[in-house]
From Swiss-Prot:
InterPro entries: B-gal_small/dom_5, Bact_Beta-galactosidase, Beta-gal/glucu_dom_sf, Gal_mutarotase_sf_dom, Galactose-bd-like_sf, GH-type_carb-bd, Glyco_hydro_2, Glyco_hydro_2_AS. The active site is at 462 (proton donor), 538 (nucleophile). GO terms for cellular component: beta-galactosidase complex. NCBIfam families: PRK09525.1 (NF007074). GO terms for biological process: lactose catabolic process. Binds 2 magnesium ions per monomer. Binds 1 sodium ion per monomer. Homotetramer. The record marks 358, 392 as: Transition state stabilizer. This is Beta-galactosidase. It comes from Escherichia coli O1:K1 / APEC.
Amino acid sequence: MTMITDSLAVVLQRRDWENPGVTQLNRLAAHPPFASWRNSEEARTDRPSQQLRSLNGEWRFAWFPAPEAVPESWLECDLPDADTVVVPSNWQMHGYDAPIYTNVTYPITVNPPFVPAENPTGCYSLTFNIDESWLQEGQTRIIFDGVNSAFHLWCNGRWVGYGQDSRLPSEFDLSAFLHAGENRLAVMVLRWSDGSYLEDQDMWRMSGIFRDVSLLHKPTTQISDFQVTTRFNDDFSRAVLEAEVQMYGELRDELRVTVSLWQGETQVASGTAPFGGEIIDERGGYADRVTLRLNVENPELWSAEIPNLYRAVVELHTADGTLIEAEACDVGFREVRIENGLLLLNGKPLLIRGVNRHEHHPLHGQVMDEQTMVQDILLMKQNNFNAVRCSHYPNHPLWYTLCDRYGLYVVDEANIETHGMVPMNRLTDDPRWLPAMSERVTRMVQRDRNHPSVIIWSLGNESGHGANHDALYRWIKSVDPSRPVQYEGGGADTTATDIICPMYARVDEDQPFPAVPKWSIKKWLSLPGEMRPLILCEYAHAMGNSLGGFAKYWQAFRQYPRLQGGFVWDWVDQSLIKYDENGNPWSAYGGDFGDTPNDRQFCMNGLVFADRTPHPALTEAKHQQQFFQFRLSGRTIEVTSEYLFRHSDNEFLHWMVALDGKPLASGEVPLDVGPQGKQLIELPELPQPESAGQLWLTVRVVQPNATAWSEAGHISAWQQWRLAENLSVTLPSASHAIPQLTTSGTDFCIELGNKRWQFNRQSGFLSQMWIGDEKQLLTPLRDQFTRAPLDNDIGVSEATRIDPNAWVERWKAAGHYQAEAALLQCTADTLADAVLITTAHAWQHQGKTLFISRKTYRIDGHGEMVINVDVAVASDTPHPARIGLTCQLAQVSERVNWLGLGPQENYPDRLTAACFDRWDLPLSDMYTPYVFPSENGLRCGTRELNYGPHLWRGDFQFNISRYSQQQLMETSHRHLLHAEEGTWLNIDGFHMGIGGDDSWSPSVSAEFQLSAGRYHYQLVWCQK
């Protein structure tokens, strides 16, 4: 029977979800994850605890538009029309309500602490059984690892408590509410609460019980908290494991705590003590606490490179050894400190190869499973990442255990963001919001402080700088001086951060924003009195086809010791799967669910697609972050290791010399390089090529044996050098055939054997080619100066809010997309051994000339068409996206073969990872399926391209696919693209960079813009 005080009406009347002073009711204090083993061996080996029971699975669910619409009867029994949903899940992924994607703008009217009356509410219920043994002694808790955004809990019709902060556990004591046998839980989840104002992160806004739910049985007298810390002497040869243990329950003299440290099957150290803490002040110490210190000789240190772990088992027992319960955690012996302006791990300066990671799954929303977490970690390690920032909230508890074990440095970030507030620190400088902020910071620290992978605490993200930040910074430094604290808000270098941690600061360019200037990272280091390390909390915005200029950051990181790396934004595209009317899945972004407000495709900034398929940019990141660097001098290769702790015990260096992709010599040498060491490798006398071509030396570091995170044969690093070649000239063989020119009223036609070329005299374009009777072109060969806009070209521009500074808006305003060709010249001449076509076009818009393109086409007796192109660019038109040619080939071949940079997509400012070789790929692999279609698939540095019967030679860039630039530009989602007839070929003499320092302002560096007034390129086109 529901008591009056437990009634839904009474609970709703309090409106706890609109009171920033109420962040919880009856919630238990935060602590590390517990399992309450009753066998110390099971604790040591981390076996499943019999005292920990999952409640994940099918729950009954009913959705209402507001909490007031929930009937009182729901507390007692399931509603007749209730559905069944899986917990954990987001209810939006089950068709209830709509997910909302917004970056800065709050999804609700900003009126803190109040939320809309229309507040979608999910009512969950579960019937489960409890064994009598759990009720006879001890305490039964329920743990909700994550509920968004706030919830009330009832058990057997009685109100238990309230919780908010969607990214940390809410734990309640159910002991007084349970009875043996069948019990019923009722959980009312509200989509919006005052806590939503602190959760304005750039992500999908979803709701529900989206993390694990479990029951935990603890003894009446129990371990209520424990903290482990490692300390060292100067040379790390001796360590102390300090364990502070706190108990709850009857404090009896016979109680003891034993802490034992294990390395595998070996007990390294152990200590036992009664309760009674060290003296704190004149009143004494804590009677319910004890601190034990275990000495460890020559500890094996933990790092992301070598994640050595011990296991600490904490036993609560009586004096005669009777075990009451045991808790345990992995222990990594490591020290983090800042000294002389450097962030040090175990005395060595770190170089952070980091990435920001949202918890996102394309099918399950914000629900994370172990398989996906492990997949992310393996991909990060395989691509030379060593650090991850939990952006922008504490992650699933299992994530930290996996980072401990596989080896990743973690920035653990509080679930605080008020980006949409004006000013941004409106709440964070308001003392009424300090309790809510405090809970989010302190509970994160209390949950995660035993993880060695957590090396930095973060106070949150994009919330300005307020007095509350200063207070919480001081609290962390007081309770956990073993880790630095970072916080970007307020300018990235306030008193609330130990690390200068800007976002999207550029290498050499200042961004003098009012109040919070964003200096170049080089300048920041030299500001008067500034001696902190600089680690970019976000940089290299990887939205769509991006990450241009990434190499420039890494050049600076390696040049300036206090520039200690950064965290790329971000790891995974946040697209969600929807289904069309035929049941086919497609990738959706902001606005596709009818969600308003929305920020469209801005949710897709990942180095990997939502299904974890890599973007081409991931290879660039891997290459720039590689742990081996190479220098070539003569025939000597100098290999430098950037590992701080790891000796190269699983690496071979494979080298190969190739002429135009044909191997001439190769070899393999084992690497024997110590941490931060060097190895010189002398190559044998290299063979001299007998023919013309490009001679390249390629080195690759290969791991012959599988590791915990990679398969055997994994390539971890590589480099290429172009070698000097002998001068060699291959003269064309004489041809007795002479192409024949005929002229009609509309065309010039050239014929040679079974080949014909047709130039339209009115347009001046190559309008058709024949091989035998087969036409080769579906569209004429024309100049091309534009590209389907990248996200970086678009910036923040949209239909209702034009940004005139965005590249695409400049190109549109100047008429680049609408330019039409005015023919200035089209002549044909018969030479002694060839036919020469000469054309000139003025590309104009509204009477203004933007480009003048002059071409000659020389068709010789071998059937080769040599195209020379000279382009003049108007001085007052924006720098073009490309200078090249385009046509639609009639042929559709299965494969593309080219000699140039590859195999992955590459662009002028993102090509350091590409290698020069002869590549052969399916046509479908030449297209990169960005969810928001754009220019894609370029391959630079190309000397030869083979496709179907066609061969192109020169020095050019190309992309080739079934989609035109026009279709890419006009299509909003990749699943709406349709394969066009034939194949679209774009061959560029020059192509602008793609940028990527950020995606909302022009970020293509000057050296990668097409800023010259005149351009020339040459191309040879023939048929095989």
